[in-house]
């Protein structure tokens, strides 16, 4: 008689659970800043807000948001172009009595709003003025320290208001960096799948599918990404939001952050303020795809078509520094297993960097 036939044990109960925090309202399009008031009303966010912005982004979009939301809410304004622990603490003091937080600007502003709202247990609304990385929609925030950027877990925006006219008017370099950040999903997924096979790391098939599809759409339509075109801004912003949602589904940044991101963080430590986050991720993606045995030339060509850098020289970084970044990558978030943790020697690192320049 089989053990199951005895029926002495109670039946196993399905007890898995998953808490996913996702943006509830997403508005992307031409001249949509005016829709922030009905969105906040729909979400019942409250009657007082702290608007965090930078000097230039306040002029480009912040004042419009302030005027629109000011008709129904009391709005305080906090201006800072930098992000640091000191800035975050100062912004928290300004936000302690408000109902919600609005971030109007680029990555530093959005990340500041994200951390402040998380620490104070408030909701926040993301109003990006550039589409340079997937932080506009994700739960992750990056804070620079003396040893490089530190990635923190916060919560995603409850709403995203992205005006394509404003985003398209930003320097094309920012949009191209955003594209590269999304394209890096390709190798992030490969690393995640490898960690699942080798280390038994849990993996979300839904997050994998969404992340991969988002990267594929950008690669297949790379020739449509053009400077100062709202259609391009629309296309890239939607992809960045999808990438952020994939991370929320997974409950981690795994669907969009693998070895290429570890390389990016290492490069940022060794050559600060040289490359944008998405730019260095794009370069790292080419290397990672080569190591995975994938179509690295195709990735490189897509990045070139978009206008993103594909070599260290393109961003003013010496090849020797890039070699050191490759060797350092495995020390960044060592708990995250990637292809760069498989044992890259100095000789192979030098060859990998030279490979970027190959015909």
Curated annotation (Swiss-Prot):
Needed cofactors: Zn(2+)
Subcellular location: Cytoplasm
Keyword line: Cytoplasm, Lipid biosynthesis, Lipid metabolism, Metal-binding, NAD, NADP, Oxidoreductase, Phospholipid biosynthesis, Phospholipid metabolism, Zinc
InterPro entries: G1P_dehydrogenase_arc, G1PDH, Glycerol_DH
Binding, Zn(2+): 181, 261, 277
GO molecular function, one term: glycerol-1-phosphate dehydrogenase (NAD+) activity
Pathway this chain belongs to: Membrane lipid metabolism; glycerophospholipid metabolism
Assigned EC number: 1.1.1.261
One term under GO cellular component: cytoplasm
Enzyme class per UniProt: oxidoreductase
Catalytic activities: sn-glycerol 1-phosphate + NAD(+) = dihydroxyacetone phosphate + NADH + H(+); sn-glycerol 1-phosphate + NADP(+) = dihydroxyacetone phosphate + NADPH + H(+)
Binding site for substrate: 134, 181, 265
Cofactor descriptive note: Binds 1 zinc ion per subunit.
Disulfide topology: none
Any Pfam family: Fe-ADH_2
Function: Catalyzes the NAD(P)H-dependent reduction of dihydroxyacetonephosphate (DHAP or glycerone phosphate) to glycerol 1-phosphate (G1P). The G1P thus generated is used as the glycerophosphate backbone of phospholipids in the cellular membranes of Archaea.
Family indicated by similarity: Belongs to the glycerol-1-phosphate dehydrogenase family.
HAMAP family per UniProt: G1P_dehydrogenase_A
Record-given protein name: Glycerol-1-phosphate dehydrogenase [NAD(P)+]
Organism: Methanoregula boonei (strain DSM 21154 / JCM 14090 / 6A8)
């Amino acid at each position: 008689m089989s053990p199951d036939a005895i029926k002495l044990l109670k039946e196993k109960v399905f007890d898995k659970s998953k808490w996913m925090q996702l943006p509830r309202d997403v508005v992307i399009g031409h001249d949509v800043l005016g829709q922030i008031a009905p969105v906040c009303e729909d979400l019942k966010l409250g009657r007082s807000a702290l608007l965090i912005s930078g000097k230039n982004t306040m002029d480009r979009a912040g004042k419009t948001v302030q005027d629109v939301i000011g008709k129904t809410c009391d709005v305080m304004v906090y201006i800072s172009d930098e992000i640091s622990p000191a800035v975050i603490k100062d912004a928290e003091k300004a936000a302690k009595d408000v109902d919600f937080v609005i971030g109007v600007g680029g990555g530093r502003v959005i990340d500041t709003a994200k951390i402040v709202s998380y620490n104070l247990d408030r909701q926040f609304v993301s109003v990006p003025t550039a589409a340079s990385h997937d932080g506009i929609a994700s739960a992750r925030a990056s804070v620079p320290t003396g040893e490089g950027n530190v990635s923190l877990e916060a919560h995603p925006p409850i709403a995203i208001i992205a005006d394509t006219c404003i985003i398209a008017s930003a320097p094309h370099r920012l949009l191209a960096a955003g594209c590269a950040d999304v394209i890096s999903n390709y190798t992030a997924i490969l690393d995640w799948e490898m960690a699942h096979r080798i280390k038994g790391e849990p993996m979300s098939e839904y997050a994998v599918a969404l992340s991969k599809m988002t990267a594929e759409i950008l690669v297949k339509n790379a020739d449509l990404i053009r400077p100062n075109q709202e259609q391009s801004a629309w296309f890239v912003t939607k992809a960045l939001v999808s990438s952020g949602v994939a991370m929320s589904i997974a409950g981690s940044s795994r669907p969009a952050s693998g070895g290429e991101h570890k390389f990016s963080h290492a490069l940022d430590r060794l050559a600060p303020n040289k490359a944008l986050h998405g730019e260095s991720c794009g370069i790292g993606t080419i290397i990672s795809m080569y190591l995975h045995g994938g179509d690295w030339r195709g990735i490189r060509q897509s990045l070139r078509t978009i206008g993103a850098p594909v070599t260290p020289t393109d961003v003013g970084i010496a090849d020797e520094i890039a070699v050191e970044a490759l060797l350092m990558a495995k020390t960044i978030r060592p708990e995250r297993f990637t292809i760069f943790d498989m044992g890259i020697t100095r000789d192979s690192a030098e060859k990998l960097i030279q490979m970027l320049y190959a015909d």
